[in-house]
């Protein structure tokens, strides 16, 4: 009787193990990033003239730069040299110390911030609904799931998610807005391997312009 009971217990455990594996596979959706694209921009994305960036003190010498439609440019370098400050100065989020930036015509920019602090009691669903009020709940859930978020993540408050999961919520907004230029500040920083690979593929396929900090 003991052997039979033990065999039954082992049989039940095997079934449970199988169920666990199936459930885990189901609850790890593979991300699919397909950026919605706007009409083509003008020839120039931006031009800077003797731009000096910084806050209290200069972080750069005067920079005269330009970026044309279709270019994909990566800004590389050690932390703290001013890559994010340059990006924010170009888009007008912070004022330069001196010099000027001229933005091109017909720009539909999409900006991905490296870090964003979430403090409000807002679920992922509500966060996307704020951005896309015409979406149905099904469309909101579907958009978030395509970014690799599980049902549990989607129904959670954004502030309790991990850095990688919060990044996927921000990517969801970016992907579903029509853009022709992407300004990305270390977008792969907190992402898992699958999401990193999919984002690389999507950025290669993107027909617009890209300025990327990595």
Describe every region a protein language model picked out.
Residues 1-36, 98, 133-135, 139:
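Extended, highly charged alpha-helical segments
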Residues 29, 35-214:
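ABC ATP-binding cassette signature C-motif
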